[in-house]
Amino acid sequence: ASKYSERLCSLIIHGSIYKRDDTQKRVVLNRLNVAKMNRPTSKHTALRRWLSEDFIKKNPEIYKTIYSLLEKNDHKNFIKIYEIFVNYEDDDSMIKKINVNTLITTGENDVGSTPEMARNLSKIIKGSKFVEIKNGKHLCSIECADDVNIIFKNFIDKNNAQT
């Protein structure tokens, strides 16, 4: 999007990290170390971070499905990718080049891709809009699907109408 904004009608950034503080960096590094040692525990912990307890209780099949998808991941490749995620540093000069109507969203209760991160990201992308998904965690696109889809659809429709 920073190189080819002219090719886009709009951009949606959902559940993204931005400018982790030192505590947040330690937390994701710790998650990496746990994932290296204890695969099942890290998957269950991740799902509880991504979905509310109430949703998990009411939707055990969805929980099982997502867990089984995580189980199918190649563990060595997951660790390699997660190391990149842990060590990622934001490039503000690149981000500031984004010049398209941008919607930035995250769940109200997302502890990894926090509302504060999303708000701060929206401050450096010219003309962007931030929307916090009420009661959402990291997988609010599943748990709060109707809300997320309406927000996305309205944003896309508005921006497609302008072209």
Model-found features: residue ranges?
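Hydrophobic "lid"/C-terminal helical patch
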Residues: 46, 82, 121, 148, ...
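Catalytic active-site module of serine/aspartate enzymes centered on a nucleophile-bearing elbow/loop
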Residues: 127-163
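Conserved alpha/beta-hydrolase "acid-adjacent" motif
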Residues: 111-117
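Conserved alpha/beta-hydrolase catalytic His-Asp/Glu region
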Residues: 22-26, 39-96
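Short beta-strand/loop motif that positions the catalytic acidic residue
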Residues: 98, 104-106, 110
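Flexible "cap/lid" loop of the alpha/beta hydrolase fold
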Residues: 2-39
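Active-site-adjacent alpha-helix of alpha/beta-hydrolase-fold enzymes
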Residues: 119-128
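Conserved hydrophobic packing residues within short motifs/helices of P-loop NTPase cores
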Residues: 12, 103-105, 131
